[in-house]
From Swiss-Prot:
Produces ATP from ADP in the presence of a proton gradient across the membrane. The gamma chain is believed to be important in regulating ATPase activity and the flow of protons through the CF(0) complex. The lineage of its organism: Bacteria, Pseudomonadati, Bdellovibrionota, Bdellovibrionia, Bdellovibrionales. InterPro entries: ATP_synth_F1_ATPase_gsu, ATP_synth_F1_gsu, ATP_synth_F1_gsu_CS. It comes from the Bacteria. Keywords: ATP synthesis, Cell inner membrane, Cell membrane, CF(1), Hydrogen ion transport, Ion transport, Membrane, Transport. It comes from Bdellovibrio bacteriovorus (strain ATCC 15356 / DSM 50701 / NCIMB 9529 / HD100). GO terms for biological process: proton motive force-driven plasma membrane ATP synthesis. The gene is atpG. It holds the Pfam family ATP-synt. F-type ATPases have 2 components, CF(1) - the catalytic core - and CF(0) - the membrane proton channel. CF(1) has five subunits: alpha(3), beta(3), gamma(1), delta(1), epsilon(1). CF(0) has three main subunits: a, b and c. It is found in: Cell inner membrane. This is ATP synthase gamma chain.
C-alpha cells in the first residue's frame, strides 16, 4: 500500500496536470473563436464568387480546364489535412483511417494515388506504412493564412493542368461545432459549380448578362476567378480543419480536467482514510502503553 507521502505526491502531481489541461482548454477556446470567425467571414464572399463564375460560364458558354471532367479517372491526388500536434482526441486518427480506407479500396482500380499532407500527424501515420508524400506542409496551426492556402492551391493546380492527375480530392474534418467534427472527402478538381442549377436560373432570368461587354474577355475573367475560387476552397478546408482541431482539443482538455478532479477527490479520500487509520493506530499504541505502565 502507498504511504501518505506517496499519495500526497500523487495529489500534487495531478493538481499540476489539472492546471495545465485547464490552461490548454482556455487557449484552445480562444483559438477556436478566431478560427470560427474566419469561416463565417469568408462564406458570403465564397458564395458570391461562385455565383459570379457560374453566371458568366452559363450566359457566355465559357469553360476552362479546371472545370472539365476527365472521361476516365486514373490518377488521383489525395490532400490530407491533419494537425501537427496531438492531445485532441480522435481528431487525427479519424482522418488517417478515412484516408487509408479510401487508398485501400481504390488502389486496385486506379493507376496512381499520390498523397499531399498538410499536418505532421497524417504524414507520420502514412510514413510508418511505407507511403511517401509528393509534398508535406507543417505548422498549419501557427501559419494558417490565405498565403499558405494559395501556395498549396497553386502547387495542386499546376500539377492538375499539366495532366499529372485526373482528379484531386481533399480529406479533412468538416467543422460542425466545438464538440462535433465530421470527416469529409471533397472533390477539389475538377471544380463543380452546380452548373445545372445556375443554367435553369439563367434561362428564367433576364438576359442582362448576355448584353454585357467584358473587359478583358470572359475566358480570361473565368480563369482568374476560378483560380481565386480554388484558393478560397483550399483555405476554407484548412480553416475548418484548424477550427475542428481546436474544438477537439478543447473538448479533450475539458475531459482531462474533469478526470483529474475526480482522481484528486479519490486520492484525497484515500489519503484521509490512511491518515485516520494511522492516527487511530497511534492512539491505540499510546493507550496500550499507558495501560501497560499502570499494570
Amino acid at each position: 500500500m502507498a504511504s501518505l507521502k506517496d499519495i500526497r505526491a500523487q495529489i500534487e502531481s495531478t493538481k499540476n496536470t489539472q492546471q495545465i489541461t485547464k490552461a490548454m482548454k482556455l487557449v484552445s477556446a480562444a483559438k477556436l473563436r478566431k478560427a470560427q470567425n474566419n469561416i463565417v467571414n469568408m462564406r458570403p464572399y465564397a458564395l458570391a464568387l461562385r455565383q459570379v463564375i457560374a453566371d458568366i460560364a452559363v450566359t457566355n458558354k465559357v469553360s476552362h480546364p479546371l472545370m472539365e471532367k476527365k472521361e476516365q479517372v486514373k490518377n488521383v491526388l489525395l490532400v490530407v489535412i491533419t494537425s501537427d500536434r496531438g492531445l485532441c482526441g480522435a481528431f487525427n486518427s479519424n482522418i488517417n483511417k478515412f484516408a487509408e480506407a479510401y487508398y485501400n479500396s481504390n488502389k486496385a482500380s486506379l493507376e496512381k494515388i499520390d498523397f499531399l499532407f498538410v499536418g505532421r500527424r497524417g504524414h507520420d501515420y502514412f510514413a510508418r506504412r511505407g507511403i511517401k508524400a509528393v509534398d508535406y506542409i507543417t505548422k498549419l496551426d501557427k501559419d494558417i493564412s490565405y498565403e499558405l492556402a494559395s501556395k498549396v492551391a497553386n502547387r495542386v493546380m499546376n500539377d492538375y493542368l499539366e495532366g499529372s492527375y485526373d482528379e484531386v480530392r481533399i480529406v479533412h474534418n468538416e467543422f460542425k461545432s466545438a464538440i462535433s467534427q465530421v470527416v469529409t472527402a471533397e472533390t477539389l478538381l475538377p471544380i463543380d459549380l452546380g452548373m445545372t442549377t445556375f443554367k435553369k436560373e439563367a434561362d428564367t432570368a433576364s438576359n442582362f448578362a448576355v448584353d454585357m461587354i467584358f473587359e478583358p474577355a470572359p475566358e480570361q475573367i473565368i480563369k482568374e476567378l476560378l483560380e481565386k475560387h480554388f484558393e478560397l476552397q483550399v483555405y476554407r478546408c484548412m480553416s475548418e480543419s484548424v477550427a475542428g482541431e481546436h474544438g477537439a482539443r478543447m473538448s479533450a482538455m475539458e475531459n482531462a480536467t474533469n478526470n483529474a478532479k475526480e482522481m484528486i477527490n479519490k486520492l484525497t479520500l484515500t489519503y484521509n482514510k490512511l491518515r485516520q487509520e494511522k492516527i487511530t493506530t497511534e492512539l491505540i499504541e499510546i493507550v496500550s502503553g499507558a495501560e501497560a505502565l499502570k499494570g
